[in-house]
Amino acid sequence: MRSVFDSYQRNMHWRYRPKLPQTPLPTAMNPTALARLRSVLQTHVDQGLLPGAVALIHHRGHTVLHTAVGHQRPPSAESAVPAMAPDTLFRIYSMTKPIASLVAMMLMEEGRLLLSHPVAHYLPAFAGQRVYDEATGTTAPVQREATVHDLLRHTAGLSYAWEAGTVPDAYRAARVGSRRHSNADLVKALGPLPLVHQPGTRWEYSRATDVLGAVLEVIEGESLGAILQRRVFGPLGMHDTGFSVPAAQQHRLAEAFERDPQTGIGMPLIDVTAPPVFESAGGGLVSTASDYARFLQLMLGRGTAPGPDGPNGTNGLGAPVRLLGRATVDFMTADHLGNLPVAGDILPTGYGFGLGVAVRTATGQATRPGSAGHYSWSGLGGTFFFVDPAEDLFAILLTQAPGQLRYLCELYPALVYAAL
């Protein structure tokens, strides 16, 4: 399967990257705090915690910060290492999930997808599922079938199999999530396996969005990469985003330390130098800060973004791009959990979960700043974003430092909100 980058490379689109609106200083945000943000990131590079990072902040319709620190790859005695650049490519892992969820919302608006439909309506391998009881070692029938809504909000009874146990062992034995398996192969492997809880009764971060990707492929009749290109990347001008990076652009790809600088644990990242068989809706994309900002402009604009050549772009002639209605974006970014229990510690205190994003339920309770209604998510490789509609603000931080992710998710919002 060809990379979504290939056609763009052939047509020389790599020479053009849409510009985000820029604001000359002084900005609506405090310049001293913005300078401090960059300095803090540089300090982390100097301390050997990060190879490098790219930060982007967009406030009140303008990009007020887009900066790079450090290097694209860890220092090497054998060769010169390129400096981190604003257009460096990063594996964004689970920051893929909101984009796939956006496409599901588009299909819902078109009447081609119902969130109340059982997953088995689209993927028959998920019919007749059973739930495993770790205490008794037995399985029981589901009390109700998992729905598309459950996939979007991670309440389908699926898992990521990071922990020990009978069901995680079954995932590993079936090679669930193998990069050598297609989305159809994933469904065949995962569908017959027992669930870890009854659908709709608990939030548990899982392979649910990967299964959603298979649903999208069934509805559209084409690969996930082709769907995302046609529906999202093309219209928004996200020319640097896809499931792999062509050879001519691999010099722009960021890499992590071989081992975590604090724990010594190995940190292998997915290989994105060739088109994967598995186009993972849950974690497979490569992107840049500018490209992901185009997606977040759409989200902050409640379904509408300036055209790739928009008011402050390259020629000022681009028409706005509308991919969703504003009510649908509001629905997507509302809390869909209520009082459901949450498994694990991935979802921070003070947050619920919408359809592909964590949603802040109160200004307090959490350990990081943010308004109620603010939504966010991160990627395993060391990437993070948040959108704050109340402040007309979004921010992106891209690194390739898996071991520092949780710390950065706490640090970065504090640095950004300090500039308001």
PLM feature spans:
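Short, conserved catalytic-motif segment at the N-terminal edge
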Residues: 28-92, 112-114, 128-137
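Short, surface-exposed loop or secondary-structure junction motifs
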Residues: 62, 121, 128-310, 315-369
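Short, well-ordered beta-strand elements
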Residues: 64-65, 385-386, 392-400
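Generic C-terminus detector
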Residues: 401-420
